[in-house]
């Protein structure tokens, strides 16, 4: 059984990327193949991705769009608060985290961005229900601030508002970006299209829980946060066609991976083939997991002891990922949301400690 300590590593803080590179495709790409021994590691630029994949392969993107979900405000008493919208639940309602000296009670009015008032409704641990006076998405877009990850040390600016979104983001609802997609620009997508590489999208609204640390040494005791996803029939059809022609299904990002695998696992448990799905998932992928859909994965470099590091270790192999991360640190790759990327190939033999 793997423990939390098995997923720890020392990362020089200067390797945590604080800003995006001027060009999306200028980031580096570490191609990793753990199906051979020793693992094959190839240093590339992300612009070289088309040379790593083949005509007839399918790239699956997450088209969620990051909300300007962060607000500063005050209580009627004048006490300062910070609000992070976690999920829009209705036209005028949302779930949110509230940081305050004292938690507000139901019926409390909060002033946000010195622009409008919201009313606190029922508690849905660990969140509060907020009632907005106008459509949530309109007020969030107009008055909110982009929520950057906790390890990025500057406040969001105009550059972040562009670069912390994918070029294909179209469904507002996330509070964190599906960062593997940040490396794609329109010319690269057009080049892949011209090659005959297929594209499809799903939606998974990334929650703030993606940054939630694992606090138990026995990782089997960790409880994942839940996120909403939508897997459309058009994607299901493209996966079937890709399988029929012998192509690879390539998930762009761990969020795409989690949605695909959650839907496939649910379908298998129900004794039916993969089908269009709208659902919640708290899937927690660790070494020993049997992958059902995804053959290859584009992903960034993840935090020590994180659930996402466990996911990529399950996919490519624990020792393969350890070797890849050692190499990336030695070669001064940039880490986390604004950092560089990896292209991983699935290990067909699940690992157990």
Swiss-Prot record:
GO BP annotation list = queuosine biosynthetic process; tRNA wobble guanine modification
Principal subcellular localization: cytoplasm
Q: In which pathway does it act?
A: tRNA modification; tRNA-queuosine biosynthesis
Q: Report keywords, A-Z.
A: Cytoplasm, Queuosine biosynthesis, S-adenosyl-L-methionine, Transferase
The similarity comment for this entry is: Belongs to the QueA family.
User: What's the superkingdom here?
Assistant: Bacteria
Assembly and interactions? Answer: Monomer.
Q: Note whether Cytoplasm occurs among the keywords.
A: yes
This chain's protein is named S-adenosylmethionine:tRNA ribosyltransferase-isomerase
MF terms from GO for this chain are: S-adenosylmethionine:tRNA ribosyltransferase-isomerase activity
Name the gene for this chain. Answer: queA
- What subcellular compartments does it reside in? Cytoplasm
State its role: Transfers and isomerizes the ribose moiety from AdoMet to the 7-aminomethyl group of 7-deazaguanine (preQ1-tRNA) to give epoxyqueuosine (oQ-tRNA).
Keyword Cytoplasm carried by entry: yes
Task: Name the catalysed reactions.
Answer: 7-aminomethyl-7-carbaguanosine(34) in tRNA + S-adenosyl-L-methionine = epoxyqueuosine(34) in tRNA + adenine + L-methionine + 2 H(+)
Question: Organism source for this protein?
Answer: Burkholderia vietnamiensis (strain G4 / LMG 22486)
- Its EC number is 2.4.99.17
| Gene Ontology cellular-component annotations | cytoplasm
């Amino acid at each position: 059984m793997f423990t939390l300590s098995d997923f720890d590593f020392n990362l020089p803080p200067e390797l945590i990327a604080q800003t995006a590179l001027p060009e999306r495709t200028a980031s580096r790409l570490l191609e990793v193949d753990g199906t051979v021994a020793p693992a094959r590691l190839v240093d590339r630029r992300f612009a070289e991705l088309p040379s790593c994949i083949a005509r007839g392969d399918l790239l699956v993107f997450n088209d969620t769009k990051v909300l300007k979900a962060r607000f500063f405000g005050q209580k009627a008493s004048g006490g300062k608060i910070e609000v992070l919208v976690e999920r829009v639940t209705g036209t005028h309602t949302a779930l949110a985290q509230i940081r305050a000296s004292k938690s507000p009670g139901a019926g409390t009015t909060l002033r946000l961005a010195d622009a409008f008032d919201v009313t606190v409704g029922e508690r849905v641990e660990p969140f509060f229900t907020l009632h907005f006076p106008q459509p949530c998405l309109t007020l969030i877009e107009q008055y909110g601030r982009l929520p950057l990850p906790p390890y990025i040390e500057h406040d969001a600016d105009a550059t972040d508002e562009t670069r912390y979104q994918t070029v294909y983001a179209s469904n507002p609802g996330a509070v964190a970006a599906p960062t593997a997609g940040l490396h794609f620009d329109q010319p690269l997508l057009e080049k892949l299209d011209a090659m005959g590489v297929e594209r499809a999208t799903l939606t998974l609204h990334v929650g703030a829980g993606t940054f939630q640390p694992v606090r138990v040494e026995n990782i089997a005791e960790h409880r994942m946060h839940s996120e909403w996803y939508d897997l459309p029939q058009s994607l299901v059809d493209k996966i079937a066609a890709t399988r029929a022609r012998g192509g690879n299904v390539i998930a762009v990002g761990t969020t795409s991976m989690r949605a695909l695998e959650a839907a496939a696992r649910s379908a298998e448990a129900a004794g039916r083939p993969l089908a269009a799905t709208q659902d919640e998932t708290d899937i927690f992928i660790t070494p020993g997991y049997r992958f059902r859909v995804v053959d290859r994965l584009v992903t960034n470099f993840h935090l020590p002891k994180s659930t996402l590091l466990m996911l990529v270790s399950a996919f490519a192999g624990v020792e393969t990922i350890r070797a890849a991360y050692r190499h990336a640190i030695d070669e001064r790759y940039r880490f986390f949301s604004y950092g560089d990327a990896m292209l991983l190939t699935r290990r067909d033999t699940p690992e157990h400690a």
